[in-house]
Amino acid sequence: MLFAMQLASASVLPMVLKSAIELDLLEIIASQDTCMSPTEIASHLPTTNPHAPTMIDRILRLLSSYSIVTCSVRSVDDQRVYSPAPVCKYLTKNQDGVSIAALCVAAQDKVLMECWYHMKDAVLDGGIPFNKAYGMPIFDYFAKDLGSNKVFNKGMSDFSSMIIKKILETYKGFQGLTSLVDVGGGTGATLTKILSKYPTIRGINFDLPHVIQDAPEYPGIEHVGGDMFVSVPKGDAIFMKWICHDWNEEQCLKLLKNCYDALPNNGKVIVAEYILPVVPDSSLASKLSVTADVMIVTQNSGGKERTEKEFEALAKAAGFQGFQVFCNAFTIYIIEFSKNISN
């Protein structure tokens, strides 16, 4: 019964966490060497609301029950005080100035949340929840709503930076490349990380024109706007992170064949994606991948996370001879599709 009751209010935690992030509560707490009371935290906010400390206390009390912050009672004044829990390492800015916080805000943004109200109708009547909500595909919408586009890109960019940093600790497949194309590379955050470790690589950041218009200039990186279903820039290797999962088999095959044509004989596509378990379990890794899969249902026609066998079938159908799964970073796997088996 208690679990069912918790499920009934499951939306509360992510929305409260979003508010805490937007108020900078976690950053404020993490910036201090000692525990902080709600009143002390409120003093760092641009507010004259006399009820702010009480509201902050209630927000943080909830977050403490999920081990996002720690809570204790200070003996000198009998007030609850708060400090960062271990997970705050990933919810507050790291030495690179990024965290998962932007992704939390993006995932709970009004634009994406509206999709869920159309999922039932999509199951019964067909169609895509996002399209039902806004009358157009998600990426067409973001081309028009630049504010939401920036929120989405910030979430993806920060998360990408953290994922690729972890990948670079173990994956060695970028060694020896002279050029690398990041297809769907957003504003270039991922490619920047790769080139910071392999500065001799010439980077091409390839995405839709409205995406790269906000991309900052980076040394060694050329931003190219275009449509990956028409053609892909040429390079020694092509990197794609969370791209295949947006599209159905037919669309993925078209994209992968364009990649195949853009590669030299010894070229390869390097894919970073979740790999779905054939049968899910209750582990965090399994939950993350199946959650991502259902999120995609609300946004894209035919998009989905895939099992290892499904990825291999796609690679072979597109003409790639080699297929190998390498390391994973926070459940994001690196998979290579080699144009020739000798690669």
Swiss-Prot record:
Gene3D superfamilies from the UniProt entry: Vaccinia Virus protein VP39, Winged helix-like DNA-binding domain superfamily/Winged helix DNA-binding domain
Q: Does the keyword Transferase apply?
A: yes
A Pfam family reported for this protein in Swiss-Prot or TrEMBL? Dimerisation
Name the chemical reaction catalysed here.
3',5-dihydroxy-3,4',7-trimethoxyflavone + S-adenosyl-L-methionine = 5-hydroxy-3,7,3',4'-tetramethoxyflavone + S-adenosyl-L-homocysteine + H(+)
Q: Which EC number(s) does the record attach to this protein?
A: 2.1.1.-
Q: Any idea which positions bind S-adenosyl-L-homocysteine?
A: 184, 207, 227-228, 240-241
GO BP terms: namely:
flavonoid metabolic process; methylation
Instruction: Write out the catalytic residues in the record.
Output: 245, 273, 305
- Signal sequence annotation: none
Origin: domain of life: Eukaryota
**PROSITE patterns, per database record:** SAM_OMT_II (PS51683)
InterPro entries attached here?
A: COMT-like, O_MeTrfase_dom, Plant_O-MeTrfase_dimerisation, SAM-dependent_MTases_sf, WH-like_DNA-bd_sf, WH_DNA-bd_sf
Q: Identify the pathway.
A: Flavonoid metabolism
Q: Name one GO molecular function term.
A: S-adenosylmethionine-dependent methyltransferase activity
Listed CDD domains: AdoMet_MTases
Where do the coiled-coil regions begin and end?
A: none
Q: How would you classify this enzyme at the top EC level?
A: transferase
Q: How is its activity regulated?
A: Inhibited by nickel (NiCl(2) and NiSO(4)) and para-chloromercuribenzoate.
Q: Which UniProt keywords apply?
A: Methyltransferase, S-adenosyl-L-methionine, Transferase
Membership in a protein family: Belongs to the class I-like SAM-binding methyltransferase superfamily. Cation-independent O-methyltransferase family.
Q: Could you tell me what this protein does?
A: Catalyzes the 3'- or 5'-O-methylation of partially methylated flavonols, but does not accept quercetin or caffeate as substrates for methylation.
Could you identify this protein by its name? Answer: Flavonoid 3'-O-methyltransferase FOMT
Q: From the UniProt record, report the name of the gene that encodes this protein.
A: FOMT1
